[in-house]
């Protein structure tokens, strides 16, 4: 709207001889350049957008898989004791959160490729922003829940009488720690996607 007003005002001044007509042409070129950014920069932005989504899929899939497959059986005082992720509701929520984020990120790859090849609009980025914001909140909630239980499992809580178990279940705890690392990495990727989508959606004209 500002560019259109600037051009109309320049035309008015040029009509009455206040502005030389050469400035009218320069103003039109400048406005067109600012409204239409270089194609190479836009393609680079969309390429980075797609790469971040692929990295998000990889990180969330790895986090969910490592958590689901984390189990270990040890013998304590002659008794077989097994540790599995399904024994903790926080770990199950963590697995579901990353699995959902992975599936939804795969689905958003199709519109992301569509933006790359068929052109993009601020409204499309606004819907991607809403999706990324929801997925970021979901992954962060899963990370927070699993981190709290993992901390108790590694260090225990003397005040509550909870003993640390990672001294006996070292392999199990290591897989959970790696799973958390991948999930936090996925959170960073989704955060970057949220910022990028929000920046593009600001161009919506109301």
From Swiss-Prot:
User: Which is one Pfam family of this protein?
Assistant: CASP_dom
User: Where is it localised?
Assistant: Cell membrane
Q: Record's superkingdom? A: Eukaryota
**Which keywords accompany this UniProt record?**
Cell membrane, Membrane, Transmembrane, Transmembrane helix
What are the disulphide bonds in this sequence? none
Topology in the membrane?
A: Multi-pass membrane protein
Q: What cellular component terms from Gene Ontology apply here? A: plasma membrane
Give the Extracellular membrane side ranges.
65-92, 146-177
- Stretches in topological domain Cytoplasmic: 1-43, 114-124, 199-206
> Which coarse location class applies to the principal site listed for this UniProt protein?
membrane
Q: Which InterPro entries match?
A: CASP/CASPL, CASP_dom, CASPL
Transmembrane feature ranges:
44-64, 93-113, 125-145, 178-198
How the protein assembles, per its UniProt entry?
A: Homodimer and heterodimers.
- Protein family per UniProt: Belongs to the Casparian strip membrane proteins (CASP) family.
| Protein known as | CASP-like protein 1F1
**Origin organism of this chain?**
Vitis vinifera
């Amino acid at each position: 709207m500002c560019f259109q007003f600037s051009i109309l005002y320049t035309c008015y001044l040029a009509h009455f001889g206040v502005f030389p007509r050469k400035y009218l042409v320069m103003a039109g070129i400048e406005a067109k350049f600012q409204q239409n950014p270089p194609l190479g920069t836009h393609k680079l932005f969309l390429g980075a957008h797609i790469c971040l989504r692929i990295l998000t899929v990889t990180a969330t899939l790895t986090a969910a898989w490592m958590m689901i497959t984390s189990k270990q059986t040890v013998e304590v005082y002659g008794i077989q004791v097994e540790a599995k992720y399904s024994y903790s509701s926080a770990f199950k929520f963590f697995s579901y959160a990353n699995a959902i984020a992975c599936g939804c990120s795969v689905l958003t790859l199709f519109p992301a490729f569509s933006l790359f090849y068929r052109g993009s609009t601020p409204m499309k980025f606004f819907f991607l922003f809403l999706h990324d914001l929801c997925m970021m909140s979901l992954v962060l909630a899963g990370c927070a829940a699993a981190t709290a239980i993992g901390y108790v499992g590694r260090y225990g809580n003397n005040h509550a009488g909870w003993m640390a178990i990672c001294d006996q279940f070292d392999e199990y705890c290591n897989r959970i720690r790696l799973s958390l690392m991948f999930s936090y990495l996925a959170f960073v990727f989704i955060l970057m996607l949220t910022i990028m989508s929000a920046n593009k959606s600001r161009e919506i004209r109301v």
